[in-house]
Amino acid sequence: MTDTTLIIRQLGIQDYQQVWQQMREFTDTRNVLTADEIWLVQHPAVFTQGQAGKPEHLLNPTDIPVVQSDRGGQITYHGLGQQIMYVLIDIKRHKANGSELNVRQLVTALEQSVVSTLADYGIKSYPKADAPGVYVNEQKICSLGLRIRKGCSFHGLALNINMDLSPFRQINPCGYIGLEMCQMADFIPTEQAQCDKVAPKLVTHFTQLLGYNDVTTY
């Protein structure tokens, strides 16, 4: 195992809390020989609050469960048709361009992976320095939230591909009042806006940016 070894796990549709617990257990038990991993998953409808989450950003409580998470950021929504990519990376071990990878570089790599993926579909997008994530025409298409423990990351990004966006209207997404959300299906044909088609492109861009060359998919 080297710094360029990566395991990709395709988890399908799984409960948020179950996967969150698995991420914590993986991070707590990994050691210097543990390969980095990417987990690709979709979650059934759930609101998640970040560590700094404020209850007033949940505007209209519904029957959608709310989970207090340990990631960074404020409240967001997960649902089917949204591709989630969790990144379980030993930051202190990984070398990027000859220097130690830091959290800011990891966030930038995640954002750039999304920007490049969207560009593959002709969608022009951009990150914001003061509001992590990726945007199209001032609407947010991808949310980011990480947790660092023992120098290792978990949690990751959520890219809206082809989903019901209406639950976002029940919250101030990421704590921003009036922030509008969008998805890939707003800009490209539905048959192209599918998680199983978009995810491989997203992973490819991310692995190239971080220099992984020994990649195994399960």
UniProtKB/Swiss-Prot annotation:
SUPFAM superfamilies cross-referenced by the UniProt entry: Class II aaRS and biotin synthetases (SSF55681)
UniProt xrefs under CDD domains: LipB (cd16444)
Listed GO biological process terms: protein modification process
Binding site for substrate: 71-78, 143-145, 156-158
Pathway(s): Protein modification; protein lipoylation via endogenous pathway; protein N(6)-(lipoyl)lysine from octanoyl-[acyl-carrier-protein]: step 1/2
Active site: 174
Miscellaneous information on this protein: In the reaction, the free carboxyl group of octanoic acid is attached via an amide linkage to the epsilon-amino group of a specific lysine residue of lipoyl domains of lipoate-dependent enzymes.
Protein name: Octanoyltransferase
Source organism (scientific name): Histophilus somni (strain 2336)
